[in-house]
Amino acid sequence: MSILGLFQKRSSGAVARDRLQLILAHERAESGRPDLVIQLREEILAVIANHVAVEPDKVKVTLERGEGVSTLGLDIELPLGASGKLDAKLAAKLAEVAANKGGAKPASSKKAA
């Protein structure tokens, strides 16, 4: 665009198109994918079901969007075993995940008494 083009009147169609594109871009950025939380919840529930039986209504997934950051919240009510403790296999897996998150090496697979 030349300097003379700066002072030229734009057609109303071009202005409307630009405004609509701007509105759509803002709405897409605000809403994201509405089905994302539902899909994440289903996939997380399927993975957890491989290790322990969990009632689907006891799994809550939230996605909060902030300035440049999205936070995924996960709240799972795990059932207690007959002895009042988590299943040993699940407890070991949770400990391994927690250790890996901190940058530590996975714990050895020793059986607890």
UniProtKB/Swiss-Prot annotation:
State the family named in the UniProt similarity comment for this chain: Belongs to the MinE family.
Task: List, in alphabetical order, the GO biological process terms annotated in this UniProt record.
Answer: cell division; regulation of division septum assembly
Q: Does the keyword Phosphoprotein apply?
A: no
- UniProtKB keywords: Cell cycle, Cell division
> InterPro entries given for it?
MinE, MinE_sf
Which organism is this entry from?
Answer: Methylobacterium radiotolerans (strain ATCC 27329 / DSM 1819 / JCM 2831 / NBRC 15690 / NCIMB 10815 / 0-1)
Is this entry keyworded Cell cycle? yes
Name the Gene3D superfamilies on file.
Answer: Cell division topological specificity factor MinE (3.30.1070.10)
The name under which this protein is listed is Cell division topological specificity factor
> Upper lineage ranks?
Bacteria, Pseudomonadati, Pseudomonadota, Alphaproteobacteria, Hyphomicrobiales
Q: Which Pfam families did the record assign?
A: MinE
Q: Relate the protein's function as given in its record.
A: Prevents the cell division inhibition by proteins MinC and MinD at internal division sites while permitting inhibition at polar sites. This ensures cell division at the proper site by restricting the formation of a division septum at the midpoint of the long axis of the cell.
